[in-house]
Amino acid sequence: MIRTNRRKLALTSAVLAVAAMTASSLPAQAASDPGLTTTTIKLGITVPLTGIASPGYNKIPGAMKAYFDYVNANGGVNGRKITLVSKDDQYIPTTAVAKANELILRDKVFALVGTLGTASTKALTASTQLSKRGIPSLFVNTGWSGFADKKAYPTTFSILPSYQMEAKIMAKYVKETYAGKKIAIIYQDDDFGRDALAGFKQAGITFGTYIPYASGSQSLPATGAGWISKLKASGAEVTVLFGVSSASTAALANAYAAQFKTQWVLGSVGGDATTIAATNKAYVPLLFGAKGFSFAPAPTDATDEYIKLFQSIYATAQPTQTFDNNVVAGMSNAFVAVQALQAAGSNLTRAGLIKTIEAKGASFANPFLTPLGYSATAHVGATGYWIGTYDQTGALKADGGKYTVYTTDSGNGPVVESSYKRPAMPAKGLPN
């Protein structure tokens, strides 16, 4: 009996050992994390597809899907095809929470990607307990500096330079270029605008006139007119506008109507010509001469290898749509997401993806003209901007005819001219 039991035990142990060896050689099982099968990865995004903030931003999911489809047609990511589920949050935080819950609980996505807006992203991150549940929130479309704080947001990764970084770079430019001028600022009075104010303060710039506005109020006819009345009364020779594109539209249109001239310096969020054109095409020429900031190559730059690739992919996927900054943003976001998924390997898990971005993200191939700042201690995305001037078509052209990039951090670090050289694009723009 003892010998028989020993033989059975030995046989059982051998079978278990073989089974373990076999299991270790197989791809990740579909049940390891929600949103994964052996052949698919399901991602989700909430974004304003309708509502006041939808013009321009509503193109981001389509741009992301265009790049994902291109990758899928070329073999996918480690044998898996990517699907993207998009939800309309109307730029309303409570709606963003509801839509994020749908993505997580009903659609069972593996990760969120590219959620848009500071207030919406903060709300959905807290309410759905992304951090506690270990759900990655990849490359959020907001520059609020808090999302780069790993301790506060351990599963969230920024992709845009922070608003504090942008404000510090803007401040350096304004102080050096418009010394002695009367300078005013219009800013959105929420975490978006206040993050910028912290950057301006860090850079040591003060404004003669501060004009805050509540998010959404820029669409009211009296709001823009009120801004211009205050600017005229202050004698502002230079006006910084740190708001969304609909705020830029209101400011530029009312300044034109009142025949008020000031040198406009527009933050990156508020300077998209296509978004302004969605309100009224006649407003686009009003951008002429304004200063703008970007960290990606201009969408009109046909000499850039990423722009050429993205234009080709988008023309096939969305032949009736205009290729613009929003498309570049969406496709760039998708590109970096694919790099991260590829680097995480075939045995993909949520925890493994987060660790991969922390360990390797700073070296990911990407379209941006600034370094990425991902590390084991910080979830910082791009780290700088180049400065340009809008022409009569609304295109932002680099000053001096070349991209001169300035980088900084969200603290008290200096603003410096960058010597960063972007790595060559992978073959065919596919993950490597």
Segments and roles (model prediction):
Residues 1-42, 420-432:
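Short, low-complexity disordered leader/linker segments with a strong preference
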Residues 31-32, 55-62, 74-150, 159, ...:
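Beta-alpha junction/loop-to-helix N-cap segments that form part of ligand/metal-binding clefts
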Residues 33-65, 87-94, 116-117, 186-194, ...:
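Extracytoplasmic "Venus flytrap"
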Residues 94-98, 145-146, 154-259, 300-308:
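Extracellular/periplasmic Venus flytrap/periplasmic-binding protein
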Residues 362-432:
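Solvent-exposed, acidic/polar segments of extracytosolic/periplasmic ligand-binding ectodomains
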